């Protein structure tokens, strides 16, 4: 059954598939300490979901295991990207504003949920009565379950790192009551003495290995937060206008093993003029919704993208 499941997952475009048990999280105390420290910022939903994240067996009634799946989202053009602000626009000579690689195509929640839905249907066809898919949209501790399923380890940058392909991957799950044998956890920490991600973060968001202060993270500041970007941090954006890839880009596992995705939905649409610092300022709400309504850029909205773009442009100005 497991081999047939892996084969079907591969046919859908997933690069890895494993089965995780649903016993209580071993990171429960760490999650409580992280929330208590205020590292979650304004993401109050993390507090509301904490109890279930610590007890994944309670997320879906009747589920016995979680099928964990990985999608590669690295766009073809993204393989050559370097640090923020390094490229110049050929027309203006300005250094380009950056958009995180995962956000250059279609919204991954929608893309992955379509495939997860097909896999859930396959599980039902093979005897499951419970097959509930999650695409980063619930109280699921995805990275821990992926580690538990043997798909990789949690790196010092807090990302799941797959030995064969690095960390440019998205994690989806299907909770099911089908009697599948857990794959076996990947307990080996392959980060070793490397601290490149900690050293490269311009805002110091990785306060210690595997501990991220989201309130200092460029991705949080430009995606999740609705507040003005603090003056103390806005000058350190290094040109990032939506999200950030620095801690992924500098990871040796990505530099050596990451390969572009074959999935068309994640290829760079070229929808954003990264050389125009007033790109969103001139855009109407209707135009924004039409152009970005099915992309991750929809999350902060036009007001958020105007804030981000202005701050990113200022961060590239000579000091």
Language model segments and positions:
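Auxiliary alpha/beta "docking" domains used to position bulky ligands
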Residues: 1-190, 229, 238-239
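Iron-sulfur cluster-binding cysteine motifs and their immediate structural context
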Residues: 14, 196-219, 237-265
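A short, charged helix-loop
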Residues: 177-182, 216-225
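Short Fe-S-cluster ligation motifs
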Residues: 221, 225-242, 273-298
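Conserved Radical SAM active-site core
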Residues: 251, 255, 259-286
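Long, compositionally biased charged/polar accessory segments in the mid-to-C-terminal portions
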Residues: 290-291, 298-316
